[in-house]
């Protein structure tokens, strides 16, 4: 599946989820979202990609490793493996007035090595897939090509939060740190601005 300017709808729940993911983790998540969007719209996937729903309603994905890399010169396969391991360890929390859930983001990641045709397989639970596809709380629209080309995870997060907004939107620094899952990482406001805001602004400009 070539990267094009196809707009992707991402769950508002996921966009504002409190997490701190690497660039490669974000690229994997973008591919999950894109494939699920194809499923929702009933469109046919490129033959290099597949998604199967098991008898337990789990979602089994298969994607080429090349689809996670920035371009043909990117050969950071070690970072891809680390990204899958990190995603496997992470949980996503969902909470509304009636429900609280804490779930592993992905399960059973596996990489099949075959040169330029290497691919990754992994499983997503039905509840996590529902979080990805839950548009009941609003949505953000953004272009996959743009999102995939950012080199900073913070650029990706700002792009998700601000894309398609036609009116000004304000976030406090504390609110952004909470959304980005930074905790006490940048206690000084100046450090947060220098390490997060300025690098992201350079890419977004």
Positions of predicted regions on the chain:
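Charged, alpha-helix-forming regions
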Residues: 1-205
């Amino acid at each position: 599946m070539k990267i094009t300017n196809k707009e992707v709808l991402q769950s508002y729940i996921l966009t504002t989820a409190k997490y701190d993911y690497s660039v490669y983790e974000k690229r994997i998540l973008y591919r999950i979202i894109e494939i699920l969007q194809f499923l929702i719209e009933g469109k046919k996937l490129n033959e290099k990609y597949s998604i199967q729903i098991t008898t337990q309603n789990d979602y089994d994905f298969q994607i080429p490793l090349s689809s996670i890399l920035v371009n043909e010169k990117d050969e950071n396969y070690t970072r891809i493996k680390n990204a899958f391991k990190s995603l496997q360890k992470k949980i996503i929390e969902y909470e509304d007035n009636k429900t609280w859930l804490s779930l592993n983001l992905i399960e059973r990641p596996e990489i099949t090595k075959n040169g330029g045709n290497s691919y990754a397989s992994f499983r997503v639970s039905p509840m996590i897939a529902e979080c990805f596809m839950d548009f009941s709380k609003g949505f953000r629209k953004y272009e996959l090509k743009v999102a995939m080309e950012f080199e900073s995870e913070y650029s990706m997060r700002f792009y998700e939060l601000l894309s398609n907004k036609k009116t000004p939107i304000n976030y406090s620094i504390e609110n952004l740190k909470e959304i980005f899952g930074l905790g006490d990482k940048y206690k000084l406001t100046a450090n947060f601005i220098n390490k997060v805001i300025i690098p992201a602004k350079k890419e977004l400009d």
